[in-house]
Amino acid sequence: MLRKVFCILLAVCLSVPLACPALAADTPDVVEMPAVVTPLQKEPAAEEPAPEDPAEEAGTSEEDAPSGLAALFDDFRAEYNLTEQNFAVSYYDTVTQESYDWNETHMMVAASTFKLPLNLYYYEMENAGEIASDALMTQGGATLDLCHYLSIVESNNEISHALLYRIGTFPEYKEAMRKYFTMTDDEIDPKYYQDNYYCTRMMMDTLKYLYARQDEFPELIDYMKQSNPQNGYFKAKVTEMEVAHKYGSFEGAENDVGIFYAEHPFLLAVYTQNVGES
């Protein structure tokens, strides 16, 4: 399983930016659009599961043990010259609850991965009856239903920016997204509020939130499975399992975050910047 994870990481690290119009301007321009008053909710920080009983770890192999996992990641970073400036990763096994994080709170250009918590936010509003799926969201008359498809599957930026600014100002949108994150004020770099910056811990928190409530968001999961390109990023090295993901590509940032439906389903968030250029 871990060998597969590293193959997936490599696929992202060495990705060549795609010549796709939807990726031409991933970073939201901070331009005001008509605001819609929506609740800016926060959740209290969630507690991580307690460490596994040492007695249970005694029978695990070096590859599966947390220390072995850390060593493998160390070797991987060294081999591909990955540093705190160009790489961050968060991994979580949903069955064993084993996790690994490296550089996970470092703010990096999120590219189109920002569309995952953004769409999740609107799906929750729909489920709560706060907005209708046929509500008109753009000046061109696109409904929220259509916006979800275009934002997640086609990674359309204009549509996604319209959704973003319907929440309010850019800082208000960023505050609204914190509903899905466990990071405290002190843990969040202020640059988070200044531009399209996120970190892999934020994306992992979002993936955990979504995975724990999959039955509430079947369309979002399905759109993530359809997300184009079908043979790129995480899916470049994965053919034997379903993957629900949201990729991002913008000026050297090659990112992907998603759910892998393996025998042990796992969550993975990878951010890179200018990796694999030399």
For the regions a language model picked out, list residue spans one by one.
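Active-site SXXK
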Residues: 97, 107-137, 151, 268
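Bacterial N-terminal signal peptides
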Residues: 9-17
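Sec-dependent signal peptide cleavage junction
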Residues: 16-30
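Beta-lactamase-like hydrolase cores
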Residues: 30-106
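Mid-domain, small-residue-enriched loop/turn segments at the edges of structured enzyme/sensor domains
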Residues: 101, 148, 159-215
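A conserved catalytic-loop motif detector
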Residues: 196-251
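Short, well-structured active-site flanking segments
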Residues: 28, 124-145, 216-220
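Short, Gly/Ser/Thr-enriched beta-strand-loop segments that form substrate-interacting elements
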Residues: 232-278
